[in-house]
Amino acid sequence: MEIKEVDDRAELLRYTNNIPLLGKLVNHQPLWSTNPKLKSFSLEKISAPDQRRVQEALVVKDLLNVLIGLEGTYIRYFNDYEPSDPETPIEFKIAKKMDPSFKTFSRRIVRYGKQYMILTRAYEKWSDTSFGMVLQRFAYEIRRFLEDVYLKTLVERLERDFNKVPNFSIRELEQIINETEVNKQMELLYNIYEEIFREIEERRTNQSSQEDFNNFMDSMKNESSLHLRLMVAFDTTVYPVPKGGAILKIFQQKILENLGDRSSVMFLKKLLNNISQDYCTMLYEWLTQGILNDPYQEFMTYDDLEGKTDNIFDTRDRAWDTQYFIRKDVLLRDCDSEEDKNLLFKMLRTGILLKVVRASLQIPTIPSNSSDITIQEINDFADLMEGSNLELYVDKCYSRANEIFLKLFFQGYDLINVLKHLQQIFLGYQSGHNVLKFLTKNMGELTKHYRNDNNANYDKLLQNFELERQSENPNNLMRQLLMIQFDTETLPQVLSHYLQIYPEVPENNSANDDSDPLMHANNFKNMNAILFDELSKERTGAYHGSNLELYTPKSAIYHLKFDINIPYPLNIIISRTCMIKYQIILRYQLVLQYHSRLLDETWMDLNKTPSWKYRGYSHTVKRRIVRATRVLHAKMNHFIKTIMEYFNQNVIDKEVYSLEKCYRNPTLAVAIQNELEGGLTNIMTNRCLSDLIPLQLQIFDIVYKFCKFIKSMRAKLCQLDPVLYEKHKSGMMKTLNEGYRTNNGGQEDVGYQEDAALELIQKLIEYISNASSIFRKCLINFTQELSTEKFDFYDSSSVDAAGIERVLYSIVPPRSASASSQR
């Protein structure tokens, strides 16, 4: 061979700022295609049988070079290979004139050199921090294997035998490679590399935004049937590089594929344990301390507020419900199926509970003796992923987190006492009479029609409320935090938003389709357009059609509401959603109490006012006005009191009893949240607050107008009898007579007139008869709607059923009662 002079110097690269941790820092060797050092000896000249050993020795020497990523004389890189270009494919070409048998051996052995070069290129690239700690550690494991195992075998066995054994052949070279586990392990590493590379390429070539949207829609469809508190908030973003669990999942799959090969499984498990060390640390810290130390976004839990300075103690914010997500892109294999939602929920919830404890106590870590349960560090990730080990480990951590969390809330913050105070205020228990006392003292102001710009009257109400609160026990935190407000929306409007008791979409609207329009969105832009359209229709009232009663001006009582901004950390259990439900329940009770007070006040008029107690009326007035008014008033009063009794005793008491039972031996924080939200939801969705509200509003309106009519009857009754008229002509009746003169065109009082009295009697009888007829019809409709026979889910043995039956038999008119019983 003729030696050529080639400039072959090793030197450091000039620009090394962006080179990964294990990246190449020196220049590449000269290529044969551009700078050949030798002029190769022709293989044709050594193809004779007696020269075959010489050719074999040359080929073996080339193969030893190829196995460490270098080209030889007769086995070279392709001419277009450029080592500085990472996108250039790595391929070797074999001399055409090589002995066919040597060429066959060479093709089989060359692939190990190709794999060595590809894996070398991979660990140089993946050692960058942008690929995350798991893939970075895998890059280190590749490098360690190539240097400590692969190259060691080449140097200590193959090169030594080639140099010292005279008859060392190409067959022996292949045999030694196959006898060791090196080739099998190299093959496994290369297969894993291919899987990771394929995943990276798919992410690079796919449209990430569309993939994100598809994942988001899948999550919406899959989670639509899950319980509110068991839903897991997913971050459906598809990241450009697979990280964390996405890499570990590939290793887990490879272990499953090689279960029949014990040595391969042991190698893969050891490799998996090594590359998962940082991940195990993150998992352990999250499940035992609620600490999320994820600098490269590869852990399954994602903190949406990381790096933000928002106040976590803001009572109006639901940060603890929305701060943490599960990255769907980096889930482990055992957490990736639809059946694993419960496991993911526990993992997410465990860290959140512990984070709340640390933030509340302002401590960096939770002492290990805070619970009776001891959690061991994760030292064998592969073993943790086998069978149900992960589920058992998470259950143990979840139980410990709940124990610490509940201990803080029940012993430290006295949660039971706080909830009792809320029940007293919002559910009408004990101290709730203070709210009712405020209602009684301000009946006049609350009867006036609500005006958003009339702040003077409402300031007076606020002052009265503050005076009432100053007399309260200062140790009652909830009472001190209680605020009175006037909502711009009436109670019926609020209920229509939350319970959809009114038909929200006209018949000709496309939203009446069986499927939700959002589910047919094609991308995020399309979804935004649909949501904007829905919001616009809601704001303009397009969905409410002919339900004008929603927007009819009403008394201030329909706008009155009480609110509490629950402080942190109590707002984690008593969320803003719970407080809105508390508000609605109390607003409904206030409306009932308001009309009950109206009826009580008019009862005083009916039974204490001289004009109503007068016994000298004619038979017609006694029977068809006085008696008919009292009977109708009694029916209205009985209806309101019956509904109040049913709502308090059969609806509220039942749910409060269930809540108190849950608080006695709490084991899970989510169970308390579910019971509280579920109990309030059951109260809110009771028929009194749902489909019966429109009928109740009609009845309330009739009651209000009839009470107003009774108030106006004092002067009118004095005009129906001459003796009563003369008796009250002076003194108290003076003002009423002036009003009567005004109503008669300002003429002077001409005394008792029988014709006018008879005409007034007829008008009063007609009004009372019409009011009684309308009330009776509303009552019949109410009882028909309340009838439980039309519901398949109705349980006749339940407490609620007994209450409904009592209400039916109590308020239904006699004829309707018999008809209802026959039906």
Curated annotation (Swiss-Prot):
Q: Which UniProt keywords apply?
A: Cytoplasm, Cytoskeleton, Microtubule, Nucleus
- Where does this polypeptide localize? Nucleus; Cytoplasm, Cytoskeleton, Microtubule organizing center, Spindle pole body
Q: Does the keyword Transport apply?
A: no
Q: Name one GO biological process term.
A: spindle assembly
GO CC list: cytoplasm; gamma-tubulin complex; gamma-tubulin small complex; inner plaque of spindle pole body; microtubule; mitotic spindle pole body; nucleus; outer plaque of spindle pole body
Name the Gene Ontology molecular function terms of this record.
Answer: gamma-tubulin binding
**Cystine bridges:** none
Pfam families in alphabetical order: GCP_C_terminal, GCP_N_terminal
Q: Has keyword Nucleus?
A: yes
Coarsely, its chief localization is nucleus
| UniProt function note | Involved in microtubule organization by the microtubule organizing center, the spindle pole body (SPB). Probably part of the microtubule attachment site at the SPB.
By sequence similarity, the record places it as follows: Belongs to the TUBGCP family.
Listed under subunit, the entry gives: Interacts with TUB4, SPC72 and SPC98.
- Recite the other comments: Present with 2230 molecules/cell in log phase SD medium.
For this entry, the protein name equals: Spindle pole body component SPC97
Record organism: Saccharomyces cerevisiae (strain ATCC 204508 / S288c) (Baker's yeast)
Gene that produces this protein = SPC97
